[in-house]
Amino acid sequence: VTNTGNVTISGLVINDAQLDAAAVCPVTTLSPGASTTCTGTHTITQAEINAGTVNNSATAVGTAPGGGTTTSPPDTTTTPITASASLTIDKTAGTPSGNTAGSTIAYSFLVTNTGNVTLTGLQVSDAQLDGPESCPVTTLAPGASTTCTGVHTITQAEVDAGVVNNSATASAFPPAGPVVTSPPDTTTTPITASASLTIDKTAGTPSGNTAGSTIAYSFLVTNTGNVTISGLVINDAQLDAAAVCPVTTLSPGASTTCTGTHTITQAEINAGTVNNSATAVGTAPGGGTTTSPPDTTTTPITASASLTIDK
């Protein structure tokens, strides 16, 4: 502060509404031409950080010998504040509600404002969620966090793979500049595979009761596991040829009926029954083989013993 007049100024003070406390002046009386340097401190506000500048104006005020007040013209400083907008996301997967397609996984997303500016319009981007995420707040001050939630319905492809991989990011708008997006966070949730088949074998009525007669068999095969089974075949050593299956890939819960034929032998006629056992075999997504428990049919053959003599 400089006294640019021709009279002594006393009671010098600084008028600056943004100072934390009154400015400190080493002297408060100035002769004409004399100067002094006063000091003060301002604590930066979040609003100023969001704006990117601190604009501060001050005047000097003193009293002339006649008692009148003298005020300097104002002087203003503009101090730039570097904005740093950033977010993090910490994704957590809950326990799946089951291990079949249609089961669900609940996710939580802890989003934190790790920058120095207020962020608005918070959103979580996760393409696998069934619907929009739910965030209790969408405006975050620096250092603040919120936990958003969402649900994903498990697909058959994920059950077959044995895992649900899910990645998410958080994004929001800083006071100025482009949208800011967090690095992605990914969860890996294992899904327990359970591959199983059943077979229900049915024997038709024999075409006759002599060697060379035939029995038509049907095999109802059901995928009773939670993974897709492919390469389905029937293991039945007594069939004349490989069983025919209209489909060889079964989704969980799906069934197909395969068919095959057996030609009755003389030994079976002599025994009076045809005992026939079969299993269904398929391949699980991981490459392992799945075999059903065997199912057996017993088909009675009517014996007819007779002789003739021609003497």
Question: What are these model-derived regions, one by one?
Answer:
Residues 1-311:
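Exported/extracytosolic protein signature
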